[in-house]
UniProtKB/Swiss-Prot annotation:
It comes from Yersinia enterocolitica serotype O:8 / biotype 1B (strain NCTC 13174 / 8081). InterPro entries: AlgH-like. This is UPF0301 protein YE3428. It comes from the Bacteria. GO terms for cellular component: cytosol. Belongs to the UPF0301 (AlgH) family.
Amino acid sequence: MNLQHHFLIAMPSLQDPHFMRSVIYICEHNKEGAMGLVINKPMEQFTVETVLKKLKISPTPRDPSIRLDKAVLAGGPLAEDRGFILHSPQEGFGSSIPISPDTMITTSKDVLETLGTPEQPKNLLVALGYAGWQQGQLEQELLDNAWLTIEADTHILFNTPIAERWQAAANKLGINIFNIAPQAGHA
């Protein structure tokens, strides 16, 4: 099982405050473990523009039609001081890894220098921190019914309002997430 480019959708019974009602985009999944970004938990009063100012980055030439007031996401409880930019494929960044034909992740500062300019990737989200699982840990959480999974949808990833992503991802499975019982059993 490889869940790269899939969503993990938190079951209603998951009460961990980092992951309650979360949607996680899995960036990497292999025999060593998994890494993903929570895509529906905005950081309070922290925007892309705030990040650029803190890092003293002034993108030029600035295109005023490109909004920089998008929320920065709390990507997960690990390495919360590290930034991750999930975006549509675009060449030329120092530290980018393709995830799917429609998404790549970049951790180098050079992508930030394009934000708000015509060179900015078409679709993007910025997250601080990530979620990670050791070997076999995610698989066990799936067996424990902590998560639902579905192949990622770039419309949900980049275009669906943040507050609607959990329900929208579950709707892709054809279910109303609010109708799921808080406990699950095995037959």
